[in-house]
Curated annotation (Swiss-Prot):
Belongs to the eukaryotic ribosomal protein eS17 family. This is Small ribosomal subunit protein eS17. One of its GO terms (molecular function) is structural constituent of ribosome. Pfam families: Ribosomal_S17e.
Length: 76
């Protein structure tokens, strides 16, 4: 089992994704690269990786939720 992410990591990741729609995807490496350019030297490498990991998880969760809502409406 993995450790639970701190709420500040979740809050930062969700704000970044919501303020920049369409930039991030399901690829951790891509998200990490984009975040490193956005947050240049403002956070540690460990924190950057934690944020990128949660961004990836958050994107997957949002897409899964959208897909299940579409199926419930009978559109898929």
């Amino acid at each position: 089992m993995g450790s639970i992410r701190p709420s500040n990591i979740k809050r930062i990741a969700e704000e970044i994704v919501d303020n920049n729609p369409g930039i991030f995807n399901e690829d951790f490496e891509n998200n990490k690269k984009i975040l490193s350019e956005m947050l240049k030297n403002s956070v540690t490498k460990k924190t950057m990786n934690a944020i990128a990991g949660y961004v990836t998880r958050y994107i997957l969760k949002k897409k899964s939720k959208e897909k299940s809502e579409m199926e419930q409406l009978g559109l898929a």
